Amino acid sequence: KFSDGQIFESAEPISVYEAAKSLYGSVSREVLAALVNGEAKELSTVISEDSDIKLLTFKDEEGKRVFRHTAAHIMAQAVKRLFPSTKQTIGPATDTGYFQDFDAEISFTPEILRDIEAEMKKIVKENLLIERSVLSKDDALALMRELDEPYKVERIEELPEDAEISIYRQGEYVDLCAGPHLHSTGAVKAFKLTQCTGAYYKGDQNNKMLQRVYGIAFPTKDELNEYVAQQEEALKRDHNKIGRELEYFTTVDSIGQGLPILLPKG
C-alpha cells in the first residue's frame, strides 16, 4: 500500500520501483528512495509481503539523507581515484550535507578539494549503477583486507559473528555501508566541497588525527546556488552583528550603511 492510499497487488516478489511503475505508469526522476514499513530503502528493494510504502524525494528529510549519503560515496570514490593510498573511515549524511574522514598522505588544501570536485563531476557523468550486496563477516573481512582498508576491517571485526554485512559498489569503488543509496551516481547533479578540518579517529584524541572533508549536494544547480547564497548572506550578517557588538565599527545613515566607520577598538 502506497502513502497516497493506492494499493498494488502482486503474486510474485517485486521491487519498489517496478511496483510504483506498474501502479502509476512511470516513476518521476525526483523519486530517490522509499520508506518501506517506516525504514528507508533503495528503490531496487524487493517486496515479498504486505508493506506500507512512501516514495521519497529531496523534499523529504529521509530522501535528503539518502541523496547526501550517495554524494559522500561519490566524494570518497573521487579521492580514491586521485590518491589510491588514502584509507577511508566513516562518511555519513548530516542535517546540512555530508562528510568523509580520510587517512591520507597528502593535505586536502583548497586546491586539492577543487581537484576532487572535478573528479566527482566525472563520476556523476559516468552515471555508475550503485549495487548492494550482502556478505558474511568472513567474506567482508577478506574483501576489505584485499582492498587494504584497515579502518573498515576494524569496524567489521567489531560486529557479531553472524552479522550480514552490506557492501555497495559503483564502478571500481567498493565500500562497507548500511545504505540506502540512490540508483546511480548520475542523480547527484550539483555539489560543492566546503571545507576540510581535523578529526580524531572515533572522536578519541588518543587516536590518529584524520582529515574530514565536508560537502553539500542538491538535485539541481539552482538549489545549490540558492543555498550557498543564503549561507554567504548569513555569514555577512554574523560579521556585521559581531563587529557592532564588539564596537569595532558602526554605520550612520547619512554616510551610508555600506561604509563602516571604524571605532577605536577597530
Regions found by a protein language model. Give the residues of each.
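Auxiliary tRNA-acceptor-end handling modules of aminoacyl-tRNA synthetases
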Residues: 45-66, 87-93, 99-266
